[in-house]
């Protein structure tokens, strides 16, 4: 006869890996960059003097395609290639007096579908430009998958004589794959101030279930939204005239100038059309704003 003895089972301690996959999931990443102008011989050279990162958000090295005394080009890298539920990205950039920096990305950013707990993502960007400095904020487009939920914030603080040229482009859904953006919620907030005085404040809730999404009085069903801004122009009226004369007119874009901010908007269905429009506008705006020609970042050509 076989006798079986039961051994006491001692529960093993649960080790928290720091990664959660429930409704409390939160995976942060941050990047802090600083740029300063250093005198050298009879000119100034902009160098990246601060580069701190946490998590999968970083830069490699600066490039000088316009010469050593020209604009400092830096590419923002996010190796995962997209933002998922619980991701929290924070970018802080400061361009000090008389420096000139251009920031862009190597590819489109992706906003993935929310998980089964509907956990949102967040992306916060804070850009600070000091007197005599110039910042070009030129990320490639953001592609929002159906069901994506999150909040995107851009805050720009400019000193009195600072200059800034930037844009944001978002494409909703994947129409080419017959996967439109029919669920989810993306809240975008923009805040641009100069000397602490708000010049442009905007909040846009992208909700495909709201009548505004399809209504002619709202987004009209447009799947691509783009906004370009420019601050520091000395001849805004002539600049707007040139934009309207040189860029082919259609009902998808318009340009305005109020309180020192030039805004060019696109509302349509084609990402390539929006991208081409903003590049054409930059070809006109950069010489007027910075007195240098519009050099294309190398990464856009790869």
UniProtKB/Swiss-Prot annotation:
Q: Which UniProt keywords are given for this protein, alphabetically ordered?
A: Chaperone, Cytoplasm, Nickel insertion
Which protein family is named in the record? Belongs to the UreD family.
The places in or outside the cell where this protein is found are: Cytoplasm
Name the GO cellular-component terms: cytoplasm
UniProt GO MF annotations = nickel cation binding
| One of the Pfam families matching this protein, by short name | UreD
HAMAP family of this UniProt entry? UreD
Q: Which PANTHER family match?
A: UREASE ACCESSORY PROTEIN D
Spell out the subunit comment: UreD, UreF and UreG form a complex that acts as a GTP-hydrolysis-dependent molecular chaperone, activating the urease apoprotein by helping to assemble the nickel containing metallocenter of UreC. The UreE protein probably delivers the nickel.
Specify the species. Answer: Psychrobacter cryohalolentis (strain ATCC BAA-1226 / DSM 17306 / VKM B-2378 / K5)
Q: What does this protein do?
A: Required for maturation of urease via the functional incorporation of the urease nickel metallocenter.
The entry's protein name is Urease accessory protein UreD 1
